[in-house]
């Protein structure tokens, strides 16, 4: 795999609370320079990213219910709609983790489905962050099944704000559950090309990283 091929797996990410307009401009310039698939930014910064990426084919992802997933479904829906209206192509929503731990699977599925049904007609894709660090393997399996049943396009390992990030074994498990019908995004703690390629070999079709430039620049060290 060469640098351009690897870059096309990557959502170049800045979800810091203190990210400035200048930080987002830099993120977008790096995305253009390295050929990353997308940038991932907080909803407030989607308009900025859309401005900086105008005329390119680089996608814009934004987050919903981030990073806890514990807000109202209606809030997630409106947040997603507004992000797409402002230029987002993809929505990375956080599953309601507490409801998942409660075993309230009907609610978890509805929470996802309502976001999916709101933005799919607008042409946007939905990734569901299941936050693997808080789940047992059985819960990870169930979460993936619910995301698939709800019509989501991807399952995603982590917010990057939890107690741990992506693990190869979790990516393998998630891929085994969703099959080839959905994407799997590995995110959190991926800092170099070796880690990124391990995730891809495990079944990830997208990598979320804030240190994407390091990932590309360490490719030659493998």
Curated annotation (Swiss-Prot):
Chemical reaction(s) catalysed: 2-deoxy-D-ribose 5-phosphate = D-glyceraldehyde 3-phosphate + acetaldehyde
Activity regulation, short description: Shows high stability to high concentrations of acetaldehyde.
Stated pH dependence: Optimum pH is 7.0. Extremely stable over a wide range of pH levels.
GO biological process: 2-deoxyribose 1-phosphate catabolic process; carbohydrate catabolic process; deoxyribonucleotide catabolic process
UniProt entry tagged with the keyword Lyase: yes
Top EC group: lyase
Complex and partners: Homodimer.
Function: Catalyzes a reversible aldol reaction between acetaldehyde and D-glyceraldehyde 3-phosphate to generate 2-deoxy-D-ribose 5-phosphate.
Similarity comment: Belongs to the DeoC/FbaB aldolase family. DeoC type 1 subfamily.
Name recorded for this polypeptide: Deoxyribose-phosphate aldolase
Gene: deoC
């Amino acid at each position: 795999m060469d640098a351009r091929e690897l870059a096309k797996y990557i959502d170049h990410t800045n979800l810091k609370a203190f990210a400035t307009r200048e930080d987002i401009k830099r993120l977008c310039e790096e995305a253009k320079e390295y050929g990353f698939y997308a940038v991932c930014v907080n909803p407030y910064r989607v308009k900025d990213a859309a401005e900086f990426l105008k005329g390119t084919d680089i996608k814009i992802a934004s987050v919903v219910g981030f990073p806890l997933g514990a807000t109202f479904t209606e809030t997630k829906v409106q947040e997603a709609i507004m992000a797409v209206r402002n230029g987002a192509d993809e929505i990375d929503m956080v599953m309601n983790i507490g409801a998942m731990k409660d075993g309230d699977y009907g609610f978890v599925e509805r929470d996802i489905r309502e976001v999916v049904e709101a933005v799919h007609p607008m042409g946007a894709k939905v990734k569901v962050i299941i936050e693997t660090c808080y789940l047992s393997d059985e819960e990870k399996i169930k979460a993936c099944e619910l995301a698939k049943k709800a019509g989501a396009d991807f399952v995603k390992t982590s917010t990057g704000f939890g107690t741990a990030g992506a693990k190869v074994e979790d990516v393998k498990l998630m891929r085994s559950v969703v099959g080839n019908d959905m994407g799997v995004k590995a995110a959190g703690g991926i800092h170099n090309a070796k880690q990124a390629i391990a995730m891809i070999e495990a079944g990830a079709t997208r990598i979320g990283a804030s240190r994407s430039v390091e990932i590309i620049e360490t490719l030659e060290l493998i």
